[in-house]
A protein has these predicted regions:
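Short beta-strand motif preference
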Residues: 37, 65-69, 187
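N-terminal alpha-helical targeting/anchoring segments
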Residues: 45-100
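Hydrophobic transmembrane alpha-helix bundles
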Residues: 71-82, 139-154, 188
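Acidic/histidine-enriched ion/cofactor-binding microenvironments in catalytic or ligand-binding pockets
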Residues: 177-188
Length: 188
């Protein structure tokens, strides 16, 4: 049985039964050289302040999975935006058909060595501050830019933040998780 590491995005806590999913993956990878089940959730937001006004704000969220089966020189891949046992079962069937090669037993490739380098904090930049705080920050930056020089006629500020959370299920390792928060601020 594979142990689950703590992660804010964990499809086994919300969408799936872990034991059933492992069985589907075992079936999909039977006789394969390599493969995995990759889960992903993305959230992003952006703000545009122009001409002293909030011109645009957007928010989007998506999630899904991909299942990869490698057999000799062939790779079968299937994906879906719906994280469910039914979707994973269909993806497994598709991946197996796509990667089907000559019969015979093969061993799965070993997972890459885990580096455990923490490159980012676990903070979600979207949830870290309120909508009004972000708008106030943009207005403060706008005022600062205009005060730098009286020749400044127009200021455009774009604030974009996102978080990508992934979980990778392989048969030879515990569930692998990563969180990638990003923030971009541009002023022109």
């Amino acid at each position: 049985m594979i142990k689950i590491n703590c992660n804010s995005f964990n499809p086994f806590k919300t969408n799936l039964n872990q034991d059933k999913t492992v069985k589907i993956l075992e079936s999909a990878l039977h006789g394969a050289d390599d493969g995995e089940l990759f889960f992903e959730r993305r959230k992003s937001e952006s703000f545009l302040l122009q001409d002293n006004k909030l011109k645009n704000s957007n928010y989007s969220s998506s999630q899904g999975f991909g299942l990869r089966v490698v057999k000799e020189e062939k790779t079968g891949y299937a994906h879906s935006n719906e994280i469910s046992e039914t979707s994973i079962r269909r993806a497994a069937e598709t991946s197996i058909r796509a990667a089907k090669g000559k019969g015979g037993k093969s061993d799965l490739a070993t997972s890459p060595v885990k580096t455990d380098k923490i490159l980012y904090s676990n903070n979600n930049p979207i949830n870290e501050f309120s909508f009004s705080y972000k708008v106030d920050l943009l207005q403060e930056i706008n005022s600062f830019a205009r005060e730098l020089d009286n020749r400044v006629a127009q200021v455009s500020i774009n604030l974009a933040s996102s978080i990508q959370e992934i979980s990778i299920l392989r048969l030879d390792t515990p569930l692998l998780n990563d969180s990638r928060p990003m923030i971009r601020l541009s002023v022109s």
